[in-house]
Each structure stands twice: as structure tokens, then as C-alpha cells.
Swiss-Prot record:
InterPro entries: Ribosomal_bL19, Ribosomal_bL19_CS, Ribosomal_bL19_sf, Translation_prot_SH3-like_sf. PANTHER family: LARGE RIBOSOMAL SUBUNIT PROTEIN BL19M, RIBOSOMAL PROTEIN L19. This protein is located at the 30S-50S ribosomal subunit interface and may play a role in the structure and function of the aminoacyl-tRNA binding site. Keywords: Ribonucleoprotein, Ribosomal protein. Belongs to the bacterial ribosomal protein bL19 family. PROSITE patterns: RIBOSOMAL_L19 (PS01015). Pfam families: Ribosomal_L19. This is Large ribosomal subunit protein bL19. GO terms for biological process: translation. The lineage of its organism: Bacteria, Bacillati, Bacillota, Bacilli, Lactobacillales.
Amino acid sequence: MDPLIQELTKEQIRDDIPAFRAGDTVTVHVRVVEGTHERIQLFEGVVIKKKGTGIGATYTVRKIASGVGVERTFPVNDPRVAKVEVKRHGRVRRAKLYYLRERHGKSARIAEARR
């Protein structure tokens, strides 16, 4: 990569995001601006994929809300994300957990890892 681009992106990369993988349950604290005031909205779910490296890296979190699956994709270096908490580490054998989209109930559970 060009040294100039590396220098510019180095300042934008966040180092306060904890290490997590696909299968981990995380809570993402998102800053939401409504009119003149700002609040924090929590989004808790299972990480079903991580994609990319550097400034363009993203991760997708899936949760079930009122019986409907909801997925949100967040950039790792997004300034709107206040913080990310890792609730539990899951034991999975895949990097992308797209198969969870077809699973319901107990078959959608992920075993806890012994880390």
C-alpha cells in the first residue's frame, strides 16, 4: 500500500475495540442523534461474520427481535460506535455463520468456548 495512504489511515484506526470472532456474543453501543440530543442504543447479538482489514473492516451482528431476525453491519472503525462489549465467546468451526439464518430455537444456539 502507498505510504501516504498508510499514514492517513493509521490515524483513523481505533484501538479501543476488543478482539472478537464469529460466534461471539457482543453488545454494540451505537450513538444515535435524534434532532438536537444524542443517546446510546444497544444492539446485542451474535457476530456472524468479520470482513476485511484496516480502515474498511466490517462485522455483522445478528439478533432475534420479536421473532424476526435482525442483522446490522458495522464498520470496525465507525465513530458512531461508542464501544463494543464481548459478552461470551462462542465455539464455532466456521468463519461465516450464514447457516444461522435458517436455524430457529435451540438449533440456533452456539456452545460457549473454553478460552
